[in-house]
Design a protein with these regions (language model features):
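Conserved, mostly hydrophobic/aromatic
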Residues: 2, 9, 38, 71, ...
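Short beta-strand elements
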Residues: 1-6, 301-304
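Active-site beta-loop-alpha junctions enriched in small/polar residues
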Residues: 19, 104-106, 131-135, 159-163, ...
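Metal- or metallocofactor-binding catalytic centers and their adjacent structured scaffolds
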Residues: 5-82
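Metal-dependent enolase-superfamily TIM-barrel catalytic cores that perform enediolate-based chemistry
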Residues: 89-201
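Conserved beta-strand positions in the central sheet of alpha/beta enzyme cores
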Residues: 15, 129, 185, 206, ...
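N-terminal amphipathic alpha-helix/helix-capping segment at the start of soluble metabolic enzymes
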Residues: 55-58, 81, 85-97, 309-312
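Shared catalytic-loop signature of beta/alpha-barrel
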Residues: 180, 189-204, 211-308, 312
């Protein structure tokens, strides 16, 4: 968690939470070290000047977008409080006040995954991310079981998190293709492999971990390799970079899932503002990470209800951190 204090006594809050050291090229100790490296270059800057902030961060440290994300988030919080506007308005305008959230379905026996979906649907959830990426035949059966208990109002994303070898990904794709309404996400660990799979399947493809910047996004699009992107804000150095990616995706006709690697109330607030400023038709689904945590630093706000997320209306991120 990052707290930025200003001369005008406005404070801004940001957060980053890597999902361990192996999921992406990020980790908690790395975030702390990167922040220590960058902070001296930021001390005298205007936090409402996001361009200057990013120029200073980039001049003091190459890469480490995830650490820069926490500073960027705090600066947007300050910009909103200083201008009296919520971050969604500053990101382009509030286009929706609420949006559908997804639940990740843990990898397990197909019957257990099926029952998990049945239970979550009874709570109002209609967006599901199925964790697969193991034996392709068993994975296809897992997806089939879930499809059996869902309808056209549900969105099913079969997400391998890059877990398959290319051959296994092709086997899984062939078996899943006949199932209705399934989106395929990140079958393999490299962009080249994912593009190969998309070129040999009719399943709509969402790419996540292999899209690390605008360049890889444009490359994947030009290769006709995806129909959607999983937009994790810390991958793109915060809301500033995420807005660029979101707007480019919209221009290219790509849908987006909006979330982050992990986080609490602050990450959830930032995600809610980016989602609220995105056209409803462009959004696949959204994740409120604070639903997955036991601890809360801002009163468990914003909070989901019956599978729906909403965005705060107060200036900045719109949440109050309990200090």
């Amino acid at each position: 968690v990052v707290r930025i204090l200003t001369d005008s006594e406005i404070e801004g809050w940001g957060e980053v939470c890597p999902l361990g050291p192996l999921y992406l090229a990020s980790h908690g100790l790395g975030a702390r070290a990167a922040l220590q490296q960058m902070l001296p270059a930021l001390n005298e800057l205007d936090p409402t000047n996001l361009s200057a902030i990013h120029a200073a961060m980039n001049a003091s440290l190459r890469g480490h977008s995830y650490a820069k994300s926490a500073i960027d988030m705090a600066c947007w919080d300050i910009l909103g409080k200083d201008s009296g506007k919520d971050v969604a308005t500053l990101l382009g305008g509030r286009l929706q006040e609420s949006f559908p959230l997804y639940k990740a379905v843990p990898l397990g026996p197909s019957e257990e995954m099926q029952q998990y979906v049945v239970d979550r649907r009874s709570e109002g959830i209609h967006r599901f991310q199925l964790k697969i990426g193991a034996n392709p035949y068993e994975d296809a059966e897992r997806v089939r079981k879930v499809v059996e208990v869902t309808t056209s109002e549900d969105v099913i994303v079969a997400d391998a998190n890059g877990g398959w070898l290319l051959q296994d990904a092709m086997i899984a794709a062939r078996l899943i293709e006949p199932l209705h309404g399934v989106l395929f996400e990140e079958p393999c660990k490299t962009l080249e492999e994912c593009l190969y799979v998309r070129q040999h399947t009719s399943l709509p493809m969402i790419l996540d971990e292999v899209i690390t910047d605008v360049n890889t996004m444009v490359r994947a699009f030009n290769a006709q390799g995806m129909e959607g992107i999983n937009l994790k804000i810390s991958k793109f150095a915060g809301l500033t970079g995420s807005k660029l990616v979101r707007d480019l995706a919209d221009s290219l006709g790509l849908r987006v899932t909006i979330e982050d690697t992990w986080g609490g109330d602050l990450v959830t607030a930032a995600v809610s503002h980016l989602a609220a400023s995105t056209r409803p038709e462009q959004v696949i689904t959204v994740s409120f990470m604070n639903d997955w945590n036991n601890e809360h630093i801002a009163g468990y706000q914003p909070r989901s209800k019956n599978g729906i997320g909403s965005v705060p209306a107060e200036p900045g991120l719109g949440v109050e951190v309990n200090v």
